[in-house]
Amino acid sequence: MHRRHVLFATIAVLAASGMVRAGLWQMRRLAERRAFNAVLSARLDSVAVPPDRLPPDTARLRYRRVRVDGVYDTAHELVLVGRTRNGSPGVNLVTPLRRPGTDTAILVNRGWVYSGNAKDVESLPRWRASSATNDSGFADVFPMGQPGPIEIPGAAAAIRRLDIGALGGRFPYPLAPYYIVLFGDTTAKLDSTPARLGMPKLSEGSHQSYVVQWFSFAGIALLGTVLYIRNDLRRMRGADAIGGADTGP
């Protein structure tokens, strides 16, 4: 082998090694996603419980089914802006739920309504509900560590995201360390009920296709290099043979 063949082979092996590592990483991500899906499926298939029976550990309560009853505090309702549904702009309505026997309120995402600018809602009071009676939902945890303000200038009730640290001062009572997303009819009623957000989707994402892609790239890099070197050596031997014939007696 010539020096350039060694160089090409070295580059191909290094590139293939990187591609194999990327494929193995995608395999680990696929295994993690499948494990998460198994937990998610089990929790969504479980029997709905009242909030008082949720696990105290927020990591264990996520996506557990909940049955909610209580009175909505519409005076402190929030409008979660920038939410799309089937390509249409809109908002989510998030309302504190007060329950008997406790001072702690739970924020409840009651669903999506249309908003042309994904911020302002025409006739907002029409979408309000005074109470929840045996409504079904699932618990979720507040996202953490997202930078930037949550307030929208000029819109007192509008927020960019649910951030319990930033929201605490808005309410005259403590908030639960989780919120509830109602599910059910995903079609907004024209009278007063927002479209529910629906159950979380089980998906493995694109990890499996990426595994095949990276391993295929690694194989192509190695095989292509072998074929190139073999053909180049064959060409060189042919050239040597012709040169030898030309210099013969």
Residue ranges and their predicted role:
Residues 1-59, 63-249:
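Surface-exposed, charge/polar-rich loops and edge strands
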